[in-house]
Amino acid sequence: MQERRVDVVLVGGGIMSATLGVLLKELEPSWSMMLLERLEGVALESTGAWNNAGTGHQALCELNYTPMRSNGEIDIQKAIKINESFEISKQFWAYHVQKKHLKEPESFIHPVPHMSFVRGKDVAYLQARHKALSLHPLFCGMKYSESMDEIERWVPLIAEGRKREERVAATCIDWGTDVNFGSLTEQFSDYLAKQEGFVLKTHHEVVDIKRSQEGHWRVKSLDKKSGEFTEVEARFVFIGAGGAALPLLYKSGIPEARGYGGFPVSGQWLVCSNPEPIEIHRAKVYGKAAVGAPPMSVPHLDTRVIDGEKKLLFGPFAGFSTNFLKQGSYLDFFLSFNSGNFKTMIEAGLDNIPLTQYLINQVMLSLKGRIEVLKEYMPKAEFGDWELKIAGQRVQIIKPDAKNRGSLQFGTEVVASNDGSLAALLGASPGASTAVEAMLGVLEKCFKKELETPLWKEKLQEMIPSYGHPLSDDLGRLNENRRYTSGLLHLPFTPVQ
């Protein structure tokens, strides 16, 4: 068995590991690092463009980030947090475009309007949401309309074929984006692979993580080509392996992982094959999720640019699969039960029977049934223009709540060892769009001393000018930041007045 020592091991070749790798390599160029990926390349699971449930999340159009309180008011706090997080991501990407670490921005980001669209009784909700968000500087420029004619100008495919008297409403922000996180991850990985002291190994599946006698971590991986096992010792390990993060976290044995479980959710897209509607539609149009639907299954008619080509997707339709990865095993879910999380998992399961029923119903939908759902957004959709494509796999967090009862959580969370030597990212949605802030969270949990040094402070400020300063609190800083990122990323800029 081959052995070696490095400062950092990154497990998983997705956007999270790539982002953390770049952050650490910029902050500590002399550190040795190794990235281990089980597949033949990076970004082939949830980070991939076809597998990502939503791209460019800024809470501009995703209605599940702005719930209505019991008193009828709209809670916009989560939307503010997500929007701030995306601004941080844009700064980080802009810095690396400027430094030529990334290719031209058109290789991974494009301007695409973000819209919300509702019908009937949901109009009052959207009106209240628009009123609440439009007062906040982060959401400046959000247009609202109940006019079918105006909505038709924004998105013809949504309005065509509707009765003119139908009660509808839409919001639109012109400066939304579409992000290809697969391309971004590939480019960051290529950049890292060229750096001294960085090793990227594909076809290497991590099978065990254990403490060494010195207090470091021994990471054991299987070379799926040769069948040989390799062991590497590291001072710090990050597990950014998507659905595989949870079982690997268990193997580490850290007490902080006790009680955590996972609930897998699969997805499927309807993909348009007719060039005409693809060309006509240019927006990400989000609607209201069905009661009981998980957040990554909010239906949307979605313009994306994948490998330089404009695409039109609808969905994702949720489903249930016991895999924790798209290219995983049907046994993943069952093998995730252990003595530390059994109670948590059973309690969460009993409390979420309606969700399970919803997912099973989604799985049972025929192609014709899915087209009928699409017609709620695009009334003149033609059956022959659409085909079904499998999306990525998500594993939602299950953990004890404040009453110590197992609870299904929607979102992401960093779980770290007490000494900061190991961290894992669990969960899904908003995911990739907030990768930079999530990985800054890893630094804050695991590298507290280093963050206090002038070297780290100055470098982080260089990469992310607003780091430590919320943009929503400073109109001048917000405009300065958006002007800077828009210029480098070739995005439209609208100053906040």
Swiss-Prot record:
This chain is encoded by the gene named mqo
Source organism:
Wolinella succinogenes (strain ATCC 29543 / DSM 1740 / CCUG 13145 / JCM 31913 / LMG 7466 / NCTC 11488 / FDC 602W)
Its keywords, alphabetically, are: FAD, Flavoprotein, Oxidoreductase, Tricarboxylic acid cycle
UniProt keyword annotation of Phosphoprotein present: no
Q: Which HAMAP family match?
A: MQO
Name-wise, this protein is Probable malate:quinone oxidoreductase
Gene3D superfamilies associated with the record: FAD/NAD(P)-binding domain
Catalytic activity as recorded in UniProt: (S)-malate + a quinone = a quinol + oxaloacetate
Q: Which GO terms describe its molecular function?
A: 2-hydroxyglutarate dehydrogenase activity; L-malate dehydrogenase (quinone) activity
Q: What Enzyme Commission number(s) appear in the record?
A: 1.1.5.4
Which SUPFAM superfamilies does the annotation name? FAD/NAD(P)-binding domain (SSF51905)
Obligatory cofactor(s):
FAD
The family assignment reads:
Belongs to the MQO family.
The stretch of residues making up the signal peptide is none
List the InterPro entries hit by this protein, alphabetically: FAD/NAD-bd_sf, MQO
What Gene Ontology terms for biological process does this UniProt record contain?
Answer: tricarboxylic acid cycle
Q: Pathway listed for it?
A: Carbohydrate metabolism; tricarboxylic acid cycle; oxaloacetate from (S)-malate (quinone route): step 1/1
- The protein's superkingdom reads Bacteria
